[in-house]
């Protein structure tokens, strides 16, 4: 029973014998790096980089559900990319706009 399930995974059109498995698997490195950047101060984050990560995640998440067969590895990595990108953008925006408003209020 276990061997038939493993054989089904091995022979799947998006299985380990194809680029459709390995590309999203290595793409997890980008999401893991973005999670590691949660500890980075917001002023060191880059708007263009986080916008690119977010847009890539959103666009490819949609694409992964349109192609046949559905590639759940591709979908999950891109949902993670979109989520981490949105979180990092929110941190950056909050830092940029909250810290700019504070000195103006303090000087009054």
Curated annotation (Swiss-Prot):
Main location: mitochondrion
Top-level taxon in the UniProt lineage: Eukaryota
Gene Ontology biological process terms from the UniProt entry: mitochondrial pyruvate transmembrane transport
Intracellular or extracellular location(s): Mitochondrion inner membrane
InterPro entries to which the protein is assigned, alphabetical: MPC
Protein keywords: Membrane, Mitochondrion, Mitochondrion inner membrane, Transmembrane, Transmembrane helix, Transport
Keyword flag Transferase: no
Lipid bilayer topology: Multi-pass membrane protein
Transmembrane parts of this sequence: 19-35, 51-67, 74-90
One GO cellular component, as annotated: mitochondrion
Family affiliation: Belongs to the mitochondrial pyruvate carrier (MPC) (TC 2.A.105) family.
PANTHER family in alphabetical order: UPF0041 BRAIN PROTEIN 44-RELATED
Function description: Mediates the uptake of pyruvate into mitochondria.
Protein name, UniProt field: Mitochondrial pyruvate carrier 4
């Amino acid at each position: 029973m276990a061997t038939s399930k493993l054989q089904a995974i091995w022979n799947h059109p998006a299985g380990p014998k194809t680029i459709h498995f390995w590309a999203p698997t290595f793409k997890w490195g980008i999401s893991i790096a973005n999670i590691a950047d949660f500890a980075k101060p917001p002023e060191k984050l880059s708007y263009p980089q986080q916008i690119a990560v977010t847009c890539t995640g959103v666009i490819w998440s949609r694409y992964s559900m349109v192609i046949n067969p559905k590639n759940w590895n591709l979908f999950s990595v891109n949902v993670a990319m979109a989520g981490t990108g949105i979180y990092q953008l929110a941190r950056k925006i909050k830092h940029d706009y909250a810290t700019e408003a504070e000195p103006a209020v303090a000087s009054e």
